Regions:
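Extreme N-terminal starter segment of soluble prokaryotic enzymes
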Residues: 1-3
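A conserved segment at the C-terminal end of the G1
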Residues: 19-26
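ATP-dependent small-molecule kinase phosphotransfer cores
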Residues: 39-98
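ATP-dependent NMP and nucleoside kinases share a basic, alpha-helical "lid"
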Residues: 89-134
Length: 148
């Protein structure tokens, strides 16, 4: 059985799709919080990963890129630590067996693995994306501003 790596557009429902695939295939899924918890078992620095975890206004990769812009030289070591910590966690979990990986640059990290299917989930219906954001308790004005 293959693993699945999913990247998604904010509000597209990609996380829900990933969880559904994992349940149907009876394999584990890992998204932000679960990957951070799993990283503990591999001796990865958790505070650093949590600091740049995905949030409502940006992706994991976006947060790393923004951090690079603030003070490029001082932050380079921290950027590498964040990315490589998540990379090692995802690779270690993948080595343990098939799983669904949601976000956290998982498609890029696992792209060289032959036993991984990569997917990008997009939703062209802006109103459906806005509705999904209400499920995670984002206020009405904020919902529309987050969906471009």
């Amino acid at each position: 059985m293959k693993s699945v790596a999913i990247e998604r557009e904010f509000g597209s429902g990609g996380r829900d799709i990933g969880i559904r695939i994992a349940k149907e295939a009876q394999i584990p899924y890992y998204d932000g919080q679960l990957l951070i918890e799993a990283a503990k078992g591999y001796g990865i620095e958790i505070a650093t990963l949590k600091e740049f975890d995905e949030n409502k206004v940006g992706s994991f990769l976006y947060n790393i890129a923004m951090m690079a812009g603030y003070n490029q030289y001082e932050n380079m070591a921290k950027i590498n630590e964040i990315f490589y910590g998540m990379k090692e966690t995802i690779k270690n979990l993948h080595a343990e067996g098939p799983a669904v990986f949601i976000g956290r640059c998982s498609t890029e990290i696992l792209k060289s693995c032959e036993d991984v299917v990569t997917v990008f989930v997009r939703c062209s219906d802006k109103e459906k994306r806005v509705q999904r954001l209400s499920l995670i308790h984002i206020s009405e004005p904020t919902r529309h501003s987050l969906i471009s």
